[in-house]
């Protein structure tokens, strides 16, 4: 697994857990990584670069949540965000953050990573659901955003 994939998966787990327990996402991310290393600071069990990328993603999503959710709501025809599975919604949030605020990551890489994470963590139809909405959003994102 690549460092960035590991970071995306950690970020997803932190955002999902934040939704469930209404706790600060950074605290949740730290707690998740500590559970891998039995209460210590993140060690070899969690790659430090993956942790840093996950932290960047979590902070980016939390800081820009209103704009990100607005884009998702705008393009998710016939789906209110309240009806979306929390896993799918948080995968979308992470990917939309990358599309809007990380122009150094190619759109096709962001989309492919989101689809792969959806296959691993989501329901049977999550990958196609995520792909459909991200395709709509990606087509409206300019390189200047």
Swiss-Prot record:
GO terms for cellular component: cytosol. SUPFAM superfamilies: NusB-like. InterPro entries: NusB-like_sf, NusB_fam, NusB_RsmB_TIM44. GO terms for molecular function: RNA binding. Involved in transcription antitermination. Required for transcription of ribosomal RNA (rRNA) genes. Binds specifically to the boxA antiterminator sequence of the ribosomal RNA (rrn) operons. Belongs to the NusB family. This is Transcription antitermination protein NusB. The lineage of its organism: Bacteria, Pseudomonadati, Thermodesulfobacteriota, Desulfuromonadia, Geobacterales. The gene is nusB.
């Amino acid at each position: 697994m690549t460092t960035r994939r590991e970071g995306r998966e950690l970020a997803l787990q932190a955002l999902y857990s934040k939704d469930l327990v209404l706790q600060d996402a950074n605290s949740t991310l730290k707690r998740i990584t500590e559970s891998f290393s039995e209460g210590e600071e993140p060690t070899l069990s969690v790659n430090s670069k993956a942790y840093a990328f996950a932290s960047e993603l979590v902070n980016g999503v939390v800081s820009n949540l209103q704009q990100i959710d607005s884009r998702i709501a705008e393009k998710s025809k016939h789906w209110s965000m309240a009806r979306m599975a929390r896993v799918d919604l948080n995968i979308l949030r992470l990917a939309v953050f990358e599309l809007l605020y990380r122009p150094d990551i190619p759109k096709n890489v962001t989309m492919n990573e989101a689809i792969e994470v959806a296959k691993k963590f989501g329901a049977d139809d999550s990958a196609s659901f995520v792909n459909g909405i991200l395709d709509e959003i990606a087509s409206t994102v300019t390189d200047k955003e």
